């Protein structure tokens, strides 16, 4: 570090605008301070008032979401992640976050540090991460740039997670032209903690010491938060220095040291250093605790020479945390972190001044009110909204605008859909991840509608899933978001769990675009509708706006991370694969289900007819609740041999996947006569689940449903050792061997990336 400060640039309006602040925001800063900010203060405001840190364009909308529940142990925004009581003295911390912009310019490091950051949020709560999931979106794999991004992101996730020692147990990958220049990389972490061992983030006690723990500080990631709050354009490649560099082995040491320090009772409060680094941690901890801090930046361990206060405050170097402890506990902290070869350097003190003050060799370089920077007094905007003009065209679509299928075309159509990268096997992805490390994984990727992990020592498990179909949200933002929540919960239900709470990652376009903001607002309404109906409160999450590229905005994509509890880990986990020859097949639907089958918004319409049109598929939330409740009851009673929800690709793909995932089994099923064959087989209306039961349990299934008047079980057929045979009305339409279905399903992704 230099002994004396270099002369910082003179702060003026032009410099503020270069930092991403608006004219109005700079005027607000001048008014609040009554003076021109220092260069370091300007940097602090620029990152903390960025959308990435402040949620200034989303807070008003997010406050409308359901956030209360009997099992929730932390309020939204109060801690680093959501915290849910799952019984037996255990709590689950879970959260999903985005790393979209960094991954667009540096896919490997961008994805890797996204994984590292979300895990830190979890173990900062005192919870040990037990599994990870991801939700990824890319453009067409026909483009070489997309293949480069896809490969880099998957390797980054795999290398970091595998080295860190936490299994990646599930996720989803979609490929749509709308994500061509702006991939989405959303990472979710789930951890477990004893309810009496949780750690807090608020710095509440003046006189406590402020300790920087973990890795040394460098120049990587400076203004990463600001970069994440701007659109991607042709010049974004120049922002590679804004992408952080992660080290999973250091993070593993940080995990063990931090959990040990929390167990030993020497951590008063703790905050991960993510976006905006020391700045965000210090200001957020002070704002939450109603206190202040004095920070001595010349004490910060650095790995590069000549770093200035501005750079130290804004660095986003990874694998660092800010710990507040009682006086006298810093020696114990230093011993614990030193044992793991990590820094534990006292850099400041909690104060009662209500100011965060930064010093360099006792010279004050910044003094700001944390409430103005990270608390309740940050700017909050409600932007103009306008219904998108494109909806006039998409809603004009009628299913009859495209020709129906002839029976002879069904097999080719089905294999085409099974070979679509959106539906096809993601084995190429999963095989790059360690899915079994730590031996908690009961059901891994692809084996069920959701992953299931063991809660050791309890007899329980967790069912976890990420979900969102951006095409649905594009066509109908409110209903599409409802479907995202409903399907995530339905997947957890089909895997044997009871959904209890959700986290969300809101990926949308430029909030200054009224059409993009309208979609965001409607999607938040939809998430709220479904969360309330399904009794799955929102525990927190992430907002990523400005997801635009030179060709336009992404599909609005509110990714849902759903948490469910499996009450009996030995009997309830349920596979998506057929289990036994002779089992009876049923389709669970709402009792009065008579909604016209349509192909609107379907993978069939997109893949076969190259159309993204119509409305989002039908969903009635009361019907959805009824079907999920019935499915949960049937699984608890031990009647269900396999369960798979009807979603992308419709009923035909659902049945085909059940065959593909089984060990040499097939099925014979008969569907009612339909006005349109394509809609009956490939329409994606919601609230449908295919289950199989032992032949002797068919009557028991009917009896069990008497307590669920809103649901009926339609007999489809039986499990066989032969092909997949489908009859619609009286007409056979499909006779395909398991091998013929499996080949395109397994080959699509490897063929596309090579």
Curated annotation (Swiss-Prot):
It catalyses: N(2)-formyl-N(1)-(5-phospho-beta-D-ribosyl)glycinamide + L-glutamine + ATP + H2O = 2-formamido-N(1)-(5-O-phospho-beta-D-ribosyl)acetamidine + L-glutamate + ADP + phosphate + H(+). The active site is at residues 52, 99. This is Phosphoribosylformylglycinamidine synthase subunit PurL. Substrate binds at residues 98-101, 120, 244, 316-318, 544. Mg(2+) 2 binds at residues 121, 272. Belongs to the FGAMS family. InterPro entries: PRibForGlyAmidine_synth_PurL, PurL_linker, PurM-like_C_dom, PurM-like_C_sf, PurM-like_N, PurM-like_N_sf. One of its GO terms (molecular function) is magnesium ion binding. Its main location: cytoplasm. One of its GO terms (cellular component) is cytoplasm. Its EC number is 6.3.5.3. ATP binds at residues 55, 95, 504, 541. It holds the Pfam family AIRS_C. Part of the phosphoribosylformylglycinamidine synthase complex involved in the purines biosynthetic pathway. Catalyzes the ATP-dependent conversion of formylglycinamide ribonucleotide (FGAR) and glutamine to yield formylglycinamidine ribonucleotide (FGAM) and glutamate. The FGAM synthase complex is composed of three subunits. PurQ produces an ammonia molecule by converting glutamine to glutamate. PurL transfers the ammonia molecule to FGAR to form FGAM in an ATP-dependent manner. HAMAP family: PurL_2. Keywords: ATP-binding, Cytoplasm, Ligase, Magnesium, Metal-binding, Nucleotide-binding, Purine biosynthesis. It comes from the Bacteria. One of its GO terms (biological process) is 'de novo' IMP biosynthetic process. Mg(2+) 1 binds at residues 97, 542. It is an enzyme of class 6 (ligase). PANTHER family: PHOSPHORIBOSYLFORMYLGLYCINAMIDINE SYNTHASE SUBUNIT PURL (PTHR43555:SF1).
């Amino acid at each position: 570090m230099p002994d004396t400060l270099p002369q910082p640039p003179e702060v003026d309006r032009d410099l503020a605008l270069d930092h991403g602040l608006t004219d109005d925001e700079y005027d607000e800063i001048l008014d609040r301070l009554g003076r021109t900010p220092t260069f370091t203060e300007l940097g602090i405001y620029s990152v903390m008032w960025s959308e990435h840190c402040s949620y200034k364009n989303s807070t008003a909308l997010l406050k409308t979401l359901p956030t209360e529940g009997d099992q929730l142990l932390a309020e939204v925004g109060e801690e680093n992640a959501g915290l849910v009581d799952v019984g037996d003295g255990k709590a689950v911390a879970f959260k999903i976050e985005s790393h979209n912009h960094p991954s667009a310019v540096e896919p490997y490091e961008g994805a890797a540090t996204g994984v590292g950051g979300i895990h830190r949020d979890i173990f900062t709560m005192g919870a040990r991460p037990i599994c990870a999931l991801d939700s990824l979106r890319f453009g067409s794999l026909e483009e070489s740039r997309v293949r480069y991004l896809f490969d880099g992101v998957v390797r980054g996730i795999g290398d970091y997670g595998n080295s860190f020692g936490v299994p990646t147990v599930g996720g989803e990958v979609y490929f749509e032209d709308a994500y061509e220049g702006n991939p989405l990389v959303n990472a979710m972490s789930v951890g477990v903690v004893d309810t009496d061992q949780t750690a807090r983030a608020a710095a509440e006690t003046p006189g406590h010491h402020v300790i920087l723990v973990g890795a040394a500080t460098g120049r990587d990631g400076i203004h990463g938060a600001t970069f994440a709050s701007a659109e991607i354009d042709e010049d974004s490649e120049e922002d590679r220095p804004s992408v952080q560099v992660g080290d999973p082995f250091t993070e593993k040491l940080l995990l063990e040291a931090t959990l040990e320090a929390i167990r030993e009772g020497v951590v008063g409060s703790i905050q991960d250093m993510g976006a905006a680094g020391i700045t965000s941690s210090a200001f957020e901890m002070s704002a939450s605790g109603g206190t202040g801090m004095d920070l001595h930046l010349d004490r910060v361990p650095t790995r590069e020479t000549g770093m200035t206060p501005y750079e130290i405050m804004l660095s986003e170097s990874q694998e660092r945390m800010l710990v507040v402890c009682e006086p006298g506990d810093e020696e114990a902290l230093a011993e614990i972190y030193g044992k793991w070869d990590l820094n534990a350097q006292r850099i400041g003190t909690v104060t009662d001044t209500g100011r965060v003050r930064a010093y360099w060799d006792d010279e004050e370089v910044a003094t700001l009110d944390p409430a103005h920077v990270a608390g309740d007094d940050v700017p909050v905007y409600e932007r103009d909204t306008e219904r998108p003009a494109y909806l006039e065209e998409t809603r004009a679509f009628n299913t009859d605008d495209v020709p129906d299928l002839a029976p002879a075309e069904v097999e080719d159509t089905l294999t085409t859909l099974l070979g679509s990268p959106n539906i096809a096997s993601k084995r190429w992805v999963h095989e790059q991840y360690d899915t079994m490390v730590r031996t908690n994984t009961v059901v891994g990727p692809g084996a069920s509608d959701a992953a299931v992990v063991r809660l050791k020592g309890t007899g329980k498990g967790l069912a976890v899933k990420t979900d969102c179909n951006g095409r649905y949200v594009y066509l109908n933002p409110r209903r599409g978001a409802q479907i995202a929540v409903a399907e995530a919960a339905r997947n957890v239900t089909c895997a044997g769990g009871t959904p209890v709470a959700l986290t969300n990652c809101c990926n949308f376009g430029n909030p200054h675009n009224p059409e993009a903001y309208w979609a965001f607002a409607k999607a938040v309404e939809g998430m709220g509708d479904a969360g309330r109906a399904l009794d799955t409160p929102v525990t927190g999450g992430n907002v990523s706006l400005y997801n635009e590229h030179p060709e336009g905005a992404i599909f609005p994509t509110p990714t849902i991370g759903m948490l469910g509890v499996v009450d009996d880990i030995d009997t309830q986990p349920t596979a998506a694969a057929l289990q036994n020859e002779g089992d009876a097949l049923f389709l669970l639907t709402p009792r009065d289900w008579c909604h016209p089958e349509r192909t609107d918004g379907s993978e069939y319409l997109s893949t076969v007819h190259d159309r993204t049109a119509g409305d989002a598929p039908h969903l009635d939330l009361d019907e959805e609740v009824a079907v999920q409740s019935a499915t949960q009851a049937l699984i608890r009673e031990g009647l269900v041999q396999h369960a798979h929800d009807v979603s992308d690709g419709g009923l035909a793909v659902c049945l085909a996947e059940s065959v593909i995932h089984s060990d040499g089994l097939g099925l014979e099923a008969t569907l009612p006569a339909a006005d349109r064959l394509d809609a009956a087989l490939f329409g994606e209306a919601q609230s449908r689940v295919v289950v199989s039961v032992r032949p002797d349990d068919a009557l028991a299934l009917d009896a069990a449903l008497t307590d669920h008047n809103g649901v009926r079980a339609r007999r489809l057929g039986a499990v066989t050792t032969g092909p997949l045979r489908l009859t619609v009305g009286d007409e056979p339409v499909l006779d395909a061997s398991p091998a013929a279905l499996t080949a395109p399903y397994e080959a699509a992704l490897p063929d596309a990336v090579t």
